[in-house]
């Protein structure tokens, strides 16, 4: 894959950091995207990232509910992110979510998305720059209501992907 070629031919691993040979900068993360309900070959990407000490953040916005080798997309990397904008598989009109099995990352994400307020009975202190990224309950209810139709939504996205693939293949383009 292109990622493997780039990492193995254009980087050096030093002290558990992947360094771009041309710029000297540390490559900190890889963000592969699963599109049209069709997962990418995430196991191969994860293996490469693990080998090169690159943090793996999966963009699973276009593959909510999809699985790869029996496992949901967004769960292979250290973090999975999903958007619920109007053009996604399911929508809340905006917003998104972060999934992780790393308790420290989850705690920090929750802290940042709830204005980074330090818990105290009467004092209002913030220890970091935080924002209010909480989804309103009405938006969340719109999202949850769509879950019973999730399989149909995924099927529709995959049909669209097949149309694109047919077009690109018939015009000598590679659709990955």
Positions of predicted regions on the chain:
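Conserved PLP phosphate-binding loop immediately N-terminal to the Schiff-base lysine helix
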Residues: 1-2, 13-44, 54-83, 89
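PLP-dependent aminotransferase class I/II
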Residues: 5-8, 13-25, 29-32, 42-44, ...
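Active-site PLP attachment segment
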Residues: 75-114, 137-140
């Amino acid at each position: 894959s292109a990622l493997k070629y780039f990492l193995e031919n254009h980087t050096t691993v030093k002290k558990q950091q992947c360094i771009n040979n041309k710029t000297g900068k540390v490559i900190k993360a890889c963000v592969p995207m699963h599109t049209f309900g069709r997962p990418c070959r995430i196991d191969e990407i994860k293996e490469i990232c693990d080998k090169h000490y690159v943090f793996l953040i999966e963009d699973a916005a276009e593959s909510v509910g999809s699985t790869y080798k029996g496992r949901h997309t967004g769960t292979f990397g250290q973090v999975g992110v999903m958007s619920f904008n109007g053009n996604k598989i399911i929508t809340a009109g905006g917003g998104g979510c972060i999934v992780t099995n790393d308790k420290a990352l989850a705690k920090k994400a929750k802290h940042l998305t709830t204005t980074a307020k330090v818990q105290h009975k009467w004092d209002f202190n913030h220890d970091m720059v935080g924002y209010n990224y909480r989804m309103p309950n009405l938006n969340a209810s719109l999202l949850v209501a769509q879950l019973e139709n999730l399989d149909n939504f995924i099927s529709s996205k995959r049909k669209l992907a097949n149309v694109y693939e047919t077009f690109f293949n018939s015009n000598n383009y590679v659709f990955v």
